Design a protein with these regions (language model features):
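Internal alpha-helical transmembrane segments
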Residues: 2-68, 222
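Juxtamembrane inter-helical linkers in multi-pass membrane proteins
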Residues: 10-24, 189-202, 267-278
Length: 302
């Protein structure tokens, strides 16, 4: 009995480039069209944008709305100074994700419960988080409303346009980062493909590198949803975010091994420009040869 013949793996074709969540699926984008690659990127970018919108809508928007309702009727930031008629230390609203606090005396005694705490002090705004604090003085050139009567209608009218702008900025920034990082990873893909005897062009390596970053972006979208539901705390979210950076490197290093081999492509090529099955029939060696016609003889044979 003869062992069953194993057919070589077929080279990946653009029709297979539809999911970038496995090394083989990412490798398929090396031979896909730019349009197909951009469409898949757009789908993942929209997934990330909608996840971010959902997180902001669930975790931050209710806190901002409640904080505005707790503001006094009169309040203003004028000439770089907060004019506040309420308590000098007052927590306007908070949850586990965000806290808004007024601390005119800069006592910092309000406690730190939320992942991000925004303190409005007498002359500056302070952002406090696990990595430390960042502050910015109020711009003395402008006046800002800090009261319920003005901020309530403004927030009600501009909440959704602001969220839409955040979503648009997220999609655009993701495309810029993906294609920029792909330029950085493309030489690595080309180098790995060379030593692994795999065939890929520079454009193909660029598209493959761009597709290799999509699994990490999907992981960020999942982390946002899990953090919004409270399934992971801020530390868990930070670990997942760090893992998404590692995922891009892993897929860029493993996907080139699923590209078609040089030997497989060479076996399909014919030096005369056609495949053997498509070319003329091969002449038998026993068949008599037809003598070549002399180009200097006349048609009558003389």
């Amino acid at each position: 009995m003869t062992p069953p013949s194993t057919a070589p793996d077929k080279p990946l074709t653009p029709r297979q480039a539809w999911q970038p969540f496995t090394p083989r699926g990412v490798a398929a984008f090396a031979h896909a069209t730019l349009t197909r690659t951009v469409l898949v990127q757009l789908a993942v970018a929209l997934l990330v944008a909608f996840s971010l919108l959902w997180f902001l809508r669930v975790a931050w928007s209710p806190v901002i709305t409640e904080a505005i309702q707790h503001l006094p009727e009169a309040g203003l930031i004028q000439r770089g100074e907060l004019i506040f008629t309420g308590e000098s230390l007052e927590r306007l609203a908070e949850n586990k994700r965000l806290a808004l606090v007024v601390d005119l005396a800069s006592t910092r005694q309000a406690g730190h419960i939320a992942d991000l705490e925004i303190l409005f002090e007498k002359n500056r705004v302070v952002l406090r988080g696990p990595l430390g604090s960042w502050w910015q003085p109020y711009d003395a050139r402008y006046n800002f409303s800090f009261n319920r009567a003005e901020l309530g209608p403004w927030w009600g009218a501009w909440q959704w346009p602001i969220l839409a702008l955040v979503a648009l900025a997220t999609v655009v920034s993701l495309f810029v980062m993906w294609w920029s990082l792909a330029l950085f990873y493309a030489p690595l893909v080309k180098l790995i493909a060379f030593f692994a005897d795999r065939a890929v062009t520079w454009r193909g390596a660029w598209r493959l590198s761009a597709a290799a970053l999509l699994p990490g972006a999907a992981l960020v979208a999942l982390a946002l949803v899990m953090h919004g539901f409270g399934a992971v705390d801020l530390l868990g979210f930070a670990l997942l975010y760090a893992l998404h950076l590692l995922a891009g490197l892993i897929f860029n290093c493993t996907s080139p091994f699923f590209l078609p081999k040089f030997s497989e492509i060479a076996s399909l090529k014919n030096p005369f420009g056609f495949y053997p099955s498509e070319g003329p029939a091969v002449k038998s060696l026993d068949a008599p040869e037809t003598p070549a016609r002399n180009p200097f003889t006349r048609r009558d044979g003389t």
